[in-house]
Design a protein with these regions (language model features):
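Active-site-proximal loop/helix segments of hydrolase catalytic cores
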Residues: 105, 176-248, 258, 262, ...
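Short amphipathic alpha-helical segments and helix-helix/interface helices
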Residues: 89, 130-137, 188, 214-216, ...
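Divalent metal-coordination and catalytic microenvironments
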Residues: 92, 122, 170, 207, ...
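Histidine-centered divalent metal-coordination motifs
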Residues: 116-117, 121-127, 256
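Metallo-beta-lactamase
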Residues: 1-84, 91-110, 117, 128-133, 144-199, 289-295, 299-303, ...
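Short, charged, surface-exposed secondary-structure boundary motifs
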Residues: 110-114, 128, 152-157, 165-170, ...
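Binuclear metal-ion centers of metallo-dependent hydrolases, dominated by the metallo-beta-lactamase
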Residues: 155-169, 183, 215-216, 245-304
Length: 304
């Protein structure tokens, strides 16, 4: 089962550490090729695999918790609810809307009826799900990206662009990926979630390479920042500060952890211990490592 609701990424204690260690042990026993076969299998086969493999059972239970939340939660005025689904996939629900970003999940298409728009930072399969994207298009809901459709589609941008969807005001800019040769590949999304959240600002950088000169269309302060665990260690800190192309976040949620389709640490399957160690060195005192299925609530200037 997912971590209990009483747990919080912001409370780092022995009980949580023990739970994360158990999850890591489950993950270590699941090889990448087995996980990929789970992603690509027929529905019935994948559901059977979930019943016999502990980390897949956890993966599905976390999804069910998120689905229940976005379907049934009533968001108080002045607040926002945030879930980590998997890897860098987040869902944010406000009193007046709901969006998702970088959703890569076996059952992702089930989210489509409940989200108003979808953001995709870049064209790598651990950051999108084809079935969810198609379901969104079928429902005539916006999908924001730099590649899915040509620029005649109003939600495609190859560079800086601003959008407004309902009460959400969205700024984007485009940056290089960490991998050499992938220039202008990753879109950064900075989203003001509207006055009914107290103008909560959420920023997600995908697999950006953290080059400040490319962060050209961002506000200098955000409430919650989602960076990846950087292979080029601590370059996450490049974008933290008061200079040009930098932001000052109230909270950082370090992500891209336990990407099960990657073969191991050398292939960027970062462990939970590595994530916690890295989080301790990020230049934001409120830096945490959430786990799949966990919900956080922004209220009165704090994330709990």
């Amino acid at each position: 089962m997912p971590l209990p609701n009483s747990y919080s990424p912001s409370i780092v204690n022995t009980e949580r550490a023990d739970a994360l260690s158990t999850i890591q042990g489950y993950a270590d026993k699941c090889l990448d090729d087995y996980f990929i076969s789970f992603l690509n299998g027929f529905d019935q086969a994948s559901m059977s695999m979930e019943k016999s493999e502990p980390i897949l059972y956890y993966y599905r239970s976390a999804f069910d918790r998120v689905m229940d939340g976005i379907e049934n939660s009533i968001v108080e005025n002045g607040t926002a609810e945030i879930w980590l689904l998997y890897n860098m996939g987040y869902i944010v629900k406000t009193p007046s809307g709901c969006f998702a970003i970088d959703i890569s999940h076996r059952w992702a298409k089930e989210l489509a009826p409940y989200i108003d728009f979808l953001c995709v930072t870049h064209k790598h399969s651990d950051h999108y799900n084809t079935d969810l994207i198609q379901a969104m298009f079928d429902l005539d809901k916006p999908v924001l990206s730099n590649y899915l459709k040509d620029t005649t589609y109003p939600y495609t941008a190859k560079g800086d662009k601003d959008y407004e969807i309902g009460k959400f005001k969205i700024r984007t800019c485009i940056t290089d990926h960490n991998n050499s040769g992938l220039s202008n590949f990753v879109t950064i999304f900075q989203i003001d979630c509207g006055d009914d959240t107290g103008n909560f600002v959420f920023m997600h950088v995908g697999d950006s390479n953290f080059k400040t000169e490319q962060y050209t269309n961002i506000a200098p302060h955000v409430n919650v920042l989602i960076p990846r665990y950087a292979p080029n260690a601590l370059t996450e800190n490049n974008i933290l500060g008061t200079g040009a192309g930098q932001v000052q976040p109230d909270y950082v949620l370090l992500s891209h952890i336990l990407e099960m389709a990657h073969a191991g640490v050398d292939a960027s399957r970062w462990s939970l211990d590595m994530a916690l160690e890295r989080a301790s060195k990020i230049n934001c005192d409120q830096t945490y490592v959430p786990m799949w299925g966990e919900k956080m609530v922004w209220k009165n200037g704090k994330l709990n």
